[in-house]
């Protein structure tokens, strides 16, 4: 089962993660090296920036990153959930969702569908029999 790794400052991302059906969840650790693929959910800080803790985690683990989602607040306009865009561009992974604060039931549903899609696609790439 896919790992969901998350970074939460105010608890919004934690609440979003708690609403997902995924069981293998862990909070970002700047010291941790992972050994299996994961999906990242983070928040956006400042003026559309990626949190430092997320950056430090990705320095060690980005090679296993399958996709990213981010929270934000729509009052920030173009900077809404901008961290997802920055991580997607830097690490060439898909954006699996953007949600406001702790997200809605629809946000969770769409994120879950995107995770399942990216995991299926990733599994097919790793299994030459499926190609």
UniProtKB/Swiss-Prot annotation:
Q: Which GO terms describe its biological process?
A: protein modification process
The cross-references to Pfam families, in alphabetical order and at most eight, read: Flavodoxin_NdrI
Q: Which SUPFAM superfamilies is this protein grouped with?
A: Flavoproteins (SSF52218)
GO MF annotation, one: FMN binding
Q: Which InterPro entries match?
A: Flavoprotein-like_sf, RNR_Ib_NrdI_bac, RNR_NrdI
What Gene3D superfamilies does this protein map onto? Answer: 3.40.50.360
Q: Which family does it belong to?
A: Belongs to the NrdI family.
Q: Main role?
A: Probably involved in ribonucleotide reductase function.
Which HAMAP family does the UniProt record give? NrdI
Name of the protein described by the UniProt record:
Protein NrdI
Tell me the organism.
Bacillus licheniformis (strain ATCC 14580 / DSM 13 / JCM 2505 / CCUG 7422 / NBRC 12200 / NCIMB 9375 / NCTC 10341 / NRRL NRS-1264 / Gibson 46)
Lineage, opening ranks? Bacteria, Bacillati, Bacillota, Bacilli, Bacillales
